[in-house]
Amino acid sequence: MIAQGEVVIENLDVRQARDGKHHSALIRAATDINVNDGVLDIQLKAIAGKPILNAIVVRKKHVVANNWQLVWGDEFEQDGAPDTSKWNYDLWPAKKVNGEDQTYTSRAKNVRVENGKLILEAHKEQHAGAEYTSARLNSRGKGDFLYGRAEIRAKIPAGQGTWSAIWMLPSDPYKYSTSCAENEDWQGSETCDAWPNSGEIDIMEHVGFDMQNIHGTVHNKAYYWQNWQQRKSSIEGKNIDQQFHRYAVEWSPETITIFFDDSPYFFYSNEATGWKAWPFDHPYHVILNLAIGGMWGRAGGPIDDSIFPVKMEIDYVRVYEKQHKNNIEKI
């Protein structure tokens, strides 16, 4: 894709879906295009296949509002283990969710604060019945919020088989569940519909076989990947494994917008049709994890064991609310 005489997207190839078997629709965003004469010139060339272009949307450059007030976060200033007043460990076996190949641990080898950064580090090793180890943290019950802005500055790893994620789940996953009790282990359960019913917001997902692309997504009962009605978008991110970038979401009762370095590329609106399309009306919490393999991580081929160890680095996590509101909730 060429805009104003410059290549802004080199490849618009439709990638495989998470199951690695099917193709999905494609929404891509290009940023930092300067128009000086009031006319935007765009050129598209089909290299292979017969693509269908449904729409082109042009938006003004986003300027982050100055009325956000910091209400929760972690700057990772103290070396050692993560602050357990802010974070919980998810200690899970391999294959619990998404077919992921790693086991999540709380060992310093896999998760630690070091030189002002949170480190999530994956290793190729046999441990607890798995062939790989890594880490996953969540802020449930310690940093839950309803509406606002969450911003995370991070550097994510390269390598075939990596699956990095910065995302959010409901702090009450059973709010819209119809098939399971509150004491049931709902994540990874095939009989509990807490997911997708109660929602999910993916601020950033990245898989190593699709190195240049960052993905933002929401999941709910009406729109999620298993019913082929996914709501997602992607943006090209250069040097994402070499430099830190900002990943953010702004969430209100009407809209969800996801950003890469303050460039908005995913937009989702409340259709006012009920909880199936908008379960995003109750507190959520932040999740940080580095998965290995799984349905999406393996979609581009086998895990490359030569890449290990690999690490995801987080500089900070910050949650803001509008100054005239009081929507932060501690559960």
Describe each region flagged by the PLM.
Residues M1-V64:
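Compositionally biased, intrinsically disordered or flexible polar/acidic segments
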Residues V63-I331:
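GH16 jelly-roll
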